[in-house]
């Protein structure tokens, strides 16, 4: 991942003085401590975007005066704006996120067919009580879900970093108690194909004609770059999905592969869940304003109460059982008997127009905040 370099503050910081420095600089305690767990000679300031370079000060007053203009605000374009991402733009955004909020941990959990990194963003809590996983862009033409998830993450990080933010105490509680795992773009090759066309990937449109048929562009494309639907790839009654559905060959949508977990993107997501065994999973898709929450009775009893809370804050309709198998959420519930939810954002035809973004975001952000309450 390319590194965005913001400024560093040269400062000798001992463990005993951390609380006092955080208070004087107006930074949330949890965010400050998690950002400065290892650094002893430089201060890392979550919620600030400092100019490049190493800056030295003789007093806390000088430091306060210097950093004041660089504090991030909820009204800032980077926090409150609407952004669209392909895989390269997402990589740059993750670098900016890490620089602005150093308590975030960013790693690569696998690679796509075309060797594009699949990133996970994590928070490591002070007291690990819960683990929650969020993902987006399993399907290529549902890339708007990445935009929604990243915008919400910025609001969470800012709220944790700045005590004057309305949701500060809620965000601090999440940082202190919850291990968050976020995969913002499961299908980077597919997103790049939909957004930029095959030439951007070094491929020709002729290669996709047998898979894509009569369509003039790639707006209908859901699958990965090999024409496998990643959300039909998981070993939860996969055979039913394979035998009852067309196509039986690679396609722009629907094809579940010749067997489960043939695709590197699906393997990466399965391995992540097997390693982490999350308490709760939220998969963002489009569209329909619905929440799928059960799978053949394998879901825990608490799911019924949780989805009622999601409905109350978002207005989305809960649906317990769906005539569908082999999805990531299906497999997660089947494998672990833990809470899993597919949230279908917005209304209309994929890919949803960005004209809907504000409406989608307002409903989804409330659901995501609620999802982090365990």
Annotate each language-model stretch with its function.
Residues 17, 21, 77-85, 138-139, ...:
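Second-shell loop/turn segments in exported
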Residues 144, 151-153, 157-292:
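Active-site/substrate-binding loop(s) of hydrolase catalytic cores
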């Amino acid at each position: 991942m390319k590194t965005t370099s913001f400024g560093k503050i040269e400062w000798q910081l001992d463990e005993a003085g951390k609380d006092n420095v955080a208070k004087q600089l107006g930074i949330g305690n949890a965010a400050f401590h998690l950002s400065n767990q290892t650094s002893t000679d430089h201060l890392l300031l979550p919620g600030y975007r400092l100019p490049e370079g190493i800056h030295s000060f003789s007093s806390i007053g000088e430091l306060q005066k210097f950093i004041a203009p660089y504090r991030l605000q909820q009204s800032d374009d980077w926090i409150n704006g609407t952004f669209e991402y392909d895989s390269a733009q997402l990589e740059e955004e993750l670098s900016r996120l890490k620089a602005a909020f150093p308590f975030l941990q960013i790693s690569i959990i696998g690679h796509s067919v075309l060797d594009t990194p699949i990133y996970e963003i994590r928070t490591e809590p002070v007291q690990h009580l819960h683990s929650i996983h969020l993902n987006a862009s399993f399907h290529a033409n549902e890339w708007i879900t990445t935009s929604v998830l990243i915008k919400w993450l910025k609001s969470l990080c800012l709220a944790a970093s700045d005590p004057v933010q309305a949701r500060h105490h809620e965000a601090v509680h999440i940082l202190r108690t919850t291990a968050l795992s976020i995969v913002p773009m499961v299908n980077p090759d597919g997103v790049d194909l939909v957004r930029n066309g095959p030439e951007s990937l070094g491929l020709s449109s002729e290669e996709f004609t047998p898979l894509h048929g009569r369509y003039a562009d790639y707006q209908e494309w859901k699958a990965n770059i090999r024409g496998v639907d990643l959300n039909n790839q998981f070993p939860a009654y996969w055979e039913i999905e394979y035998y009852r559905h067309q196509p039986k060959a690679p396609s722009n949508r629907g094809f579940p592969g010749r067997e489960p977990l043939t695709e590197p993107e699906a393997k990466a997501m399965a391995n992540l869940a097997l390693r982490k065994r999350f308490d709760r999973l939220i998969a963002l898709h489009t569209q329909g304003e619905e929440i799928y929450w059960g799978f053949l009775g394998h879901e825990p009893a608490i799911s019924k109460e949780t989805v009622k809370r999601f409905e109350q804050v978002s207005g989305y309709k809960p649906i317990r059982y769906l005539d569908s198998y082999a999805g990531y959420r299906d497999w997660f519930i089947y494998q672990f008997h833990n809470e899993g939810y597919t949230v279908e954002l917005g209304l209309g035809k994929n890919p949803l127009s960005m004209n809907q973004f504000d409406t989608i975001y307002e409903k989804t952000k409330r659901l995501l905040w609620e999802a982090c309450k365990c």
